[in-house]
């Protein structure tokens, strides 16, 4: 049933682009994408060194929704290596969440989300690490990642988690499995940008239900 014209619609998409003037919330669940191929509507980049990352859709038995997930499958062990997959539209104030499952990685098992992204070297990032048992919040400026807030707590490998953030103005809140774990402020990036997902070094991570809501 159609909503009145003044109400912004909510959409659930495989990986398609969407009209920002009509949609307030969207979820990418990757179920309309072809397994073994990159998801439609996404761009890919690399912060740091090493291989750029290989992002493909996979069908898995335990996907949080549907059957498909997005996976970064290249286990290059370069330490300062951050593959990212991102999409639009550009948003400034938003809530961003993702379901993520750390699958493998001897050096890292980092599952992250990025927002207010200008390019592969400039964005906000929060990530949960199953090898370190923590959640950190950073800004990355000209390729240099700087942590300014964090939380220590159990991040289990091999199970699905939800990582989420909300940012309005310079106020940032980060949530892990429904619990607020970080509440801070930062003025590094003040304009709208794209959003997406992130990994580190040899992390093999599955992602599903990437959801962005304009605030």
Briefly describe each language-model feature range:
Residues 82-89, 149-155, 196-197:
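Beta-strand-rich interaction surfaces with strong enrichment in secreted/lumenal proteins
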